Amino acid sequence: MPKKTATKANPKEVSDSENDSVVSEEEDNVPVTKGGKNAKASKAKPKEVSESDNSGSEQSEESEDEAPKKGKVNAKKAPAKKAPVKKGKQDSDSDNEEDEASEDGSDDEEDVVSADDSDSDEAPKGKAAKKAPAKKAPAKKAPAKKAPAKKGKAKDEDDESEDEAPKKGKGKGKATKKDGDKPKKPLSDYQKFLSKRMPELREEEPGKPYKEYMKMAGAEWTEQNGGTKKKPAAKSGSKTAKKAPAKGGSKSTAKKAPAKKAPAKKAPAKKSKKEASDEESD
């Protein structure tokens, strides 16, 4: 019974072991002789041995190639139980093949696990990328530029602000009187003469400019009055008439004249020696 299970489990291994045993028996039966036919036979046998070895190596390579082809199912299965094998080279060959198969299976398992891990790592990343798109930062709105005001409107606004400024002041606008309320200065005789004579000259000589009428009226005034432009005397009751300062002057306005210093007395000039000698002689 154990022999049959061995042949079913690993038929290739049994065939390799049988070939090796046949080769070993033939080598033992060949007598060693010098030269001749026996020598040729001995030379031919190593070729057969090498061919059998090559066939065994090819079969082992095929078994190694078939092991990864079985896929994930064979790689995950538990290693097959070792069948009882004949003593000698069969044990070593079977052990080597099982070790190689187990190594190939472990490598395949590691590759499968690493591929699964890589797929599992990449899958959630893709989902996360789809679910959570990158939020765009809200673009800052540029402050709207104010359109430059037209020059005409700006001037009007400035004028209005200037007009409103005195109204908002602290009573200054009320205290100041308008120009119409101020008393007008009385016209001089020269101005009165011009106001009468100018329209007469326009009627006499129409079509001339205003300045020429002024010159003509001024020339007539100088001929009549000798070139003096007298102003009318101020009325007694007018507010604008200035009071004449009192004679003698007030104490505040009158300036005291500085007292004159007495002239310093001159020192008598020294007499010369000649005059002194003359007086003594007298």
Swiss-Prot record:
Keyword Lyase assigned: no
SUPFAM superfamilies documented for this protein: HMG-box
Keywords: DNA-binding
GO molecular function: DNA binding
Biased composition (Basic residues): 70-87, 127-153, 253-273
Record field: compositional bias (Basic and acidic residues): 176-187, 197-214
Metal-binding among keywords: no
Signal sequence residues: none
Biased composition (Acidic residues): 16-29, 93-121
Chain positions covered by the region annotation Disordered: 1-282
Location of the DNA-binding region in this protein: 183-252
Protein name per the record: HMG box-containing protein R545
Protein source organism: Acanthamoeba polyphaga mimivirus (APMV)
